[in-house]
């Protein structure tokens, strides 16, 4: 039976994570992070906040560059993995950052689309940065995983639910996010959408179980398994080739902005 989703506009709507599933099905995220890491260009001695650090893979790379880095996330499971790597991390709600001019840069990779209160996020980042500090990030932009999001809406509608409540991600346009950054005192140096067809190293079921757990949690068994199978069937004609290889259509929003002095 379909259970009601919490309001998708509530900022603290939570995606539950499995550290083992993330390591198996989500490693492509870090593998594709080279361009955004280069845009951050961390320097020795800089104080950097990694917003949505997950299991700390990129946090460790920032630290290896000589920066003093703090990672924050809301997943106990992923933070436990990061702590095992000896990293400085803490559990925190990115919608309620309480730092004031403590960081030279704030970095975020593949996390901001999970945070449904972007105005709160950007405002908190602006306060956390020193004047001239950098906000560098990459996350899902407009059109990201469009086929998957459409299939989710179709499944919910077919079961009598509200398709408008089926998808919790925040995938803004360049214009929308650029305006948000400017409104919080940032000078935007770069902001682009980057289409990225990404072959999966796992099957679609594994990807959906890892990254759409919030969606399947609204169903009880055996319907949950039925919905997963229905999603795969809907997506197969568009995203799976004749050899059984799956590809997802990522669209990333990549940006670099600087907190203006005096803001």
Residue ranges of predicted features:
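C-terminal helical/coil "lid" or tail adjacent to the Rossmann-like core of SAM-dependent
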Residues: 189-243
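Class I SAM-dependent methyltransferase SAM/SAH-binding core
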Residues: 49, 54-97
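A short SAM/SAH-binding and catalytic strip from SAM-dependent methyltransferases
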Residues: 105-118
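A short glycine-rich, Lys/Arg-flanked "PGG" loop and its adjoining helix->strand segment in the class I
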Residues: 119-134
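A short acidic, Gly/Pro-enriched loop at the edge of an enzyme's catalytic core
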Residues: 95-106
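Short alpha-helix
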Residues: 170-184
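Conserved class I S-adenosyl-L-methionine
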Residues: 1-46, 57-61, 78-81, 136-159
């Amino acid at each position: 039976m379909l259970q009601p989703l919490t309001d998708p506009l509530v900022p603290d709507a939570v995606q539950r994570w499995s550290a083992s599933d993330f390591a198996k099905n989500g490693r492509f995220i870090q593998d594709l992070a080279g361009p955004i890491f280069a845009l951050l260009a961390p320097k020795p001695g800089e104080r950097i906040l990694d917003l949505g650090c997950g299991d700390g893979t990129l946090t460790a790379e920032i630290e290896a560059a000589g920066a003093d880095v703090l990672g924050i996330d809301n997943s106990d499971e992923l933070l436990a993995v990061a702590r095992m790597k000896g990293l400085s991390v803490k559990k925190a709600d990115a919608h309620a950052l309480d730092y004031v001019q403590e960081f030279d840069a704030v970095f975020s990779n593949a996390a901001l689309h999970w945070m449904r209160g972007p105005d709160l996020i950007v405002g908190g980042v602006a306060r956390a940065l020193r004047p001239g500090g950098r906000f560098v990030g990459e996350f899902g932009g407009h059109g990201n995983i469009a086929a998957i999001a459409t299939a989710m809406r179709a499944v919910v509608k077919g079961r009598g639910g509200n398709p408008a409540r089926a998808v919790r991600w925040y995938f803004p346009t360049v214009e929308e996010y650029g305006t948000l950054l400017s409104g919080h005192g940032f000078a935007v140096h770069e902001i682009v959408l980057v289409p990225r067809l990404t072959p999966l190293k796992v099957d679609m079921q594994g990807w959906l179980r890892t990254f759409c757990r919030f969606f399947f949690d609204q169903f009880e068994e055996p319907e949950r398994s039925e919905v997963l199978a229905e999603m795969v069937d809907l997506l197969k004609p568009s995203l799976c080739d004749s050899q059984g290889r799956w590809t997802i259509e990522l669209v990333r929003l990549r940006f670099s902005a600087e907190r203006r002095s005096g803001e």
